[in-house]
Structure formats: structure tokens, C-alpha cells
């Protein structure tokens, strides 16, 4: 009975003794979520969701509100740290075969999509030049849907162009979606602890478990402290490091930026969208670039769960990481040679990973059987 008591959960939660630092990113993500929720609430108090006042209200927050510049910069920088942590978290899951816990993986993918939607709505709110044009380009993709496209776009905009109703509903969505993220995170954690965390070897952890506290809780605290230190270093020395310079100008529908792009953490998906010279094809590729993660648990063919003992799969995995970084880089560049060619090539390699890895798993099984 005492083992079930909530006060003793941190003491008695059994965890595999060999889980590495890659398992700390879940707690770092929760820290980012807490930071975002708190700073977001205080920013919402002073923000005005009106196209004539939004830009001025952000300036008012940074200049006139006590510690407003700290809240605004923490909110912006921790959004970037949030995505860095979540991409590492997903990469860890792919490398160590954690996707075989299907419920946890699929709830996590749903979380990622919700998070991306929330970040997109938030990017529009300052009503800067790049915010406005990125919103115009991305929402305009809905017109690629046959028959319903134009109606859906007009419905989303609240008119025939991005205007005051669009900003108001984007603010409402940006405010409400974090609560959906908190709920989904709770489901994600409950599902994870229902079966228990895996380990780098991909074996059953039941034979060797230790209490979560103090062994892993201190490790979590070290990584969280390191992340918050990095956050404050960026905040203190280069707060606009991850911002787009175009967003220091108020949105102007009559002037198009030379190169429209979203925030850096969406560039991989935007690069895939841009590499296809067809609107519907690009939109489908954009959606598939994230949705393809849901297929991974169902296409696993290897007898071994983790990639730790599969050198061929490891090579393919690191190719995927290099591809992801390259797509992000090319998407930040103008649409001109050689960036278009590089973007198209890396997009093909990105999708090829998800097709090749099951075939490679099957080939590795054959090699293992031959050796035996």
C-alpha cells in the first residue's frame, strides 16, 4: 500500500540503472513547458490582439512593463530550446527503438503536431513583417485542398485576407493550445510509466532497477540547470540571436520581404515544402514530413530493438540527422541554385530513411542468422 502513496513515488519509482543522459530531455521539455506557460500568461496580460496595436503592445512590454523584456525574451528563447529538446528527444526514440511502445510514441507524435501548431500561431502574434508574410504563405496552403480549399482559407482568415479577425483567433488558439499540450503531456507520461522506460541496450530493465530518486533525479536537475544557464546566457548577451531581423518592422501587406521563411525550427518542413514545385504536392510533403513518424512502430523489422548493435542502421540514422540539418540550412536560403537542388536531394534522402530502415532491419536479421 505504501508503495502506491504519491509522496513516495519519487523515492520508489523503479528505473533501469543504465539509462543515459539522452533520457533527461523529457524533464527538460517539462521545464520548458512550465517556463512557456508562466511567461506566456504574463505576456498575455499586456498583449493586445489588434493589427493596429499588436506590434506597439510588444514594444510596450519590452520597454515599459517592469521586467517585460525578460519575460518576452525568455518566452522567445525557451521556444527555441523547447524545439531543440524535442528534436533530440525524437532522435533518441528513433535510435533506441523506443517507438515500439506504440501508445507512448503515437501520443508523442500528436504532442509534436500540437506543439508545432501552437508555435506557428505564436509566431504571428507580434505582427512583425516576417510574422505576417509567413502566416500568409502557410495559411494559403489550405487553398491546395480540392473543392474545400478556398472556403477553408476564408474561414480561417475570417475574411478575404489576413486581418484583424485572423490575429484575434490566432491569439485565442495560442492561448488555449498550451493547455491541450499539458493534458497530452500528462497522458504521454502516464502511458510511459504504465510500461516503464526502456534503456540503451533495448533489453528488459526489470532485472536491474534502482530508485528514481536520488540516482536519476539529480541527473535530471543537472541537465535542467545546464539548459536554464544556456537560456540566461543567450538572454543576457544575445537575446535576439534566434529572431528574424524582418520582425523588427511592423507588418506591411504592401511590401513583400525578399525571402519569406518561418522560424528556424520549422525550416526542415518548410524546406521539404519548397523543394516540390507543385502546391498540392508540396503541402502533402509538408504534412507527411511530420506524420511519417507515426509509421515507424509498424515498420520495425529488426530482431534487435536498439540501434546500439546495428552499425548499418546507425550509419543510416546519422545520415538522417545530417539530412535534417542540411534541409534546415537550405530552407533559410533564397530559392535559387544550388539551394533548390540541395533541398530536393535532401528531401528525397529524408523520406528514403523511413523506407530503407525496415529493409535494412530485414537484411540485418538475415546476416545474424547466417552468423549463427
Curated annotation (Swiss-Prot):
Entry keywords, A to Z: Electron transport, Heme, Iron, Membrane, Metal-binding, Mitochondrion, Mitochondrion inner membrane, Respiratory chain, Transmembrane, Transmembrane helix, Transport, Ubiquinone
Domain of life, per lineage: Eukaryota
Pfam families, per database record: Cytochrom_B_C, Cytochrome_B
Membrane topology: Multi-pass membrane protein
SUPFAM superfamilies referenced in this protein's UniProt entry, alphabetically: a domain/subunit of cytochrome bc1 complex (Ubiquinol-cytochrome c reductase), Transmembrane di-heme cytochromes
Chief location bin: mitochondrion
Cofactor remark from the record: Binds 2 heme b groups non-covalently.
Keyword match Hydrolase: no
TM region(s), chain numbering: 25-45, 69-90, 105-125, 170-190, 218-238, 280-300, 312-332, 339-358
PROSITE patterns (UniProt xref): CYTB_CTER, CYTB_NTER
MF terms (GO), sorted A to Z: metal ion binding; ubiquinol-cytochrome-c reductase activity
Residues engaged in binding heme b b566: 89, 188
CDD domains to which the protein is assigned, alphabetical: cytochrome_b_C, Cytochrome_b_N
Cofactor list: heme b
Binding site for a ubiquinone: 193
Additional information: Heme 1 (or BL or b562) is low-potential and absorbs at about 562 nm, and heme 2 (or BH or b566) is high-potential and absorbs at about 566 nm.
Subunit (UniProt): The cytochrome bc1 complex contains 3 respiratory subunits (MT-CYB, CYC1 and UQCRFS1), 2 core proteins (UQCRC1 and UQCRC2) and probably 6 low-molecular weight proteins.
Purpose: Component of the ubiquinol-cytochrome c reductase complex (complex III or cytochrome b-c1 complex) that is part of the mitochondrial respiratory chain. The b-c1 complex mediates electron transfer from ubiquinol to cytochrome c. Contributes to the generation of a proton gradient across the mitochondrial membrane that is then used for ATP synthesis.
Record protein name field: Cytochrome b
Organism listed in the record: Naja multifasciata (Burrowing cobra)
Amino acid at each position: 500500500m505504501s508503495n502506491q502513496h504519491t509522496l513516495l513515488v519519487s523515492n520508489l519509482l523503479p528505473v533501469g540503472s543504465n539509462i543515459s543522459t539522452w533520457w533527461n530531455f523529457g524533464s527538460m521539455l517539462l521545464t520548458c513547458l512550465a517556463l512557456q506557460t508562466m511567461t506566456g500568461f504574463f505576456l498575455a496580460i499586456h498583449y493586445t490582439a489588434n493589427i493596429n496595436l499588436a506590434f506597439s503592445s510588444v514594444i510596450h512590454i519590452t520597454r515599459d512593463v517592469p521586467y517585460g523584456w525578460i519575460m518576452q525574451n525568455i518566452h522567445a528563447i525557451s521556444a527555441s530550446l523547447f524545439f531543440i529538446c524535442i528534436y533530440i528527444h525524437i532522435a533518441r526514440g528513433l535510435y533506441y527503438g523506443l517507438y515500439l511502445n506504440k501508445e507512448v510514441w503515437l501520443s508523442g507524435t500528436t504532442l509534436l503536431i500540437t506543439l508545432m501548431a501552437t508555435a506557428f500561431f505564436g509566431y504571428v502574434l507580434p505582427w512583425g513583417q516576417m510574422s505576417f508574410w509567413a502566416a500568409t504563405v502557410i495559411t494559403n496552403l489550405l487553398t491546395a485542398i480540392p473543392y474545400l480549399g478556398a472556403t477553408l482559407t476564408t474561414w480561417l482568415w475570417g475574411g478575404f485576407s489576413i486581418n484583424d479577425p485572423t490575429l484575434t483567433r490566432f491569439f485565442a488558439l495560442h492561448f488555449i493550445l498550451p493547455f491541450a499540450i499539458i493534458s497530452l503531456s500528462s497522458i504521454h507520461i502516464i502511458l510511459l510509466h504504465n510500461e516503464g522506460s526502456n534503456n540503451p541496450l533495448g533489453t528488459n530493465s526489470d532485472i536491474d532497477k534502482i530508485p528514481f530518486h536520488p540516482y536519476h533525479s539529480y541527473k535530471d536537475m543537472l541537465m535542467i540547470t545546464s539548459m536554464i544557464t544556456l537560456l540566461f546566457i543567450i538572454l543576457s548577451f544575445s537575446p535576439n540571436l534566434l529572431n528574424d531581423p524582418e520582425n523588427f518592422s511592423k507588418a506591411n501587406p504592401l511590401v513583400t520581404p525578399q525571402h519569406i521563411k518561418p522560424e528556424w525550427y520549422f525550416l526542415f518542413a518548410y524546406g521539404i515544402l519548397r523543394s516540390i514545385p507543385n502546391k498540392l504536392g508540396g503541402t502533402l510533403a509538408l504534412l507527411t514530413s511530420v506524420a511519417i513518424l507515426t509509421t515507424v512502430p509498424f515498420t520495425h523489422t529488426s530482431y534487435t530493438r536498439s540501434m546500439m548493435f546495428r552499425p548499418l542502421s546507425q550509419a543510416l540514422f546519422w545520415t538522417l540527422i545530417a539530412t535534417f540539418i542540411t534541409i534546415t540550412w537550405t530552407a533559410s536560403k533564397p530559392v535559387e541554385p544550388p539551394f533548390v537542388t540541395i533541398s530536393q536531394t535532401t528531401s528525397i534522402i529524408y523520406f528514403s530513411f523511413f523506407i530503407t530502415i525496415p529493409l535494412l532491419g530485414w537484411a540485418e536479421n538475415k546476416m545474424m542468422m547466417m552468423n549463427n
